[in-house]
Structures are given as structure tokens and as C-alpha cells.
Amino acid sequence: MKVSYCIPTHDGNAKCQMYLFDIFHALEAQTDQRFDVWISDHSKSKKVYAACEDYADVLDIKYVPNDKMRGNISANTNNALRPADGDILKVLFSEDFILTRTLNQELIQAFDNTPYQWAVTGLSLIHI
């Protein structure tokens, strides 16, 4: 079983490349490496492409430029999902964090042990 991490990206935020490096670094550290990464890029610059090139020798990254409906997150997300070929498709937005080295392992185990074919994940921080 393989996970495809589908990441819609853009260059609307000055930190977009830094966030992508954070995701790539966390994926590189995963204990289970049965995954690939699909990047749909709504950028006008080459920052996202350059980040993908920096990790091309370490991660299985598929870069998909996307100039259609630029700025529409739904269209960009669909563009990342459409070509992905993993058994599990996991959307990660470019500002998302991976907080554990076992995310991929946990996703695969969760789908191995259940009849369900979809799931939603999220995180909420509450400041008191």
C-alpha cells in the first residue's frame, strides 16, 4: 500500500518555499517510505519548482504546473489529486505541518485495519 501526498501550492505567501521545505523535511524523516508527493503549482515564480528540485534526489516528487484558475484552491487541489496514483490520497496544504515521523505508517495501518475507504484528518489549537 502506498500513500500519495497531494500538495496544492502557490507563491502568494512569501514563506511558501520555507513551508514546503518543512513538509519535505518531515516526509524525508518518515519511518515508512511507501509514498510519493504530487505538487500542483499555481505559482508564477519558480520558487516551488526550485524547492521540488532540491528534494528530487531524496523524495519521489511529481511536479505538475497549473496555470488554470490560478488562485482557486479547489481547482489547484483537484489538480494535485487527479494524477495521484497511491492507494491512499492525503491532501497536505503548503502551510500544513507533519508532527510525527510515523504519519505514513499510521495512515497505512489505519486503512489496512478498516473497511472504510476515506477519512478526514485535522488539528485544532486552542489557546486558553
Where are these regions (language model features)?
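Short, acidic, metal-binding catalytic loop of nucleotide-sugar glycosyltransferases
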Residues: 22-34
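Short beta-strand/loop segment that forms part of the nucleotide-sugar
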Residues: 34-44, 64-66
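Glycine-rich, basic loop-to-helix element that forms the pyrophosphate-binding segment
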Residues: 67-84
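Short beta-strand-to-loop acidic/aromatic patch adjacent to the donor-nucleotide binding site
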Residues: 86-97
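Conserved small/polar residues in nucleotide/adenosyl-binding loops
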Residues: 126-128
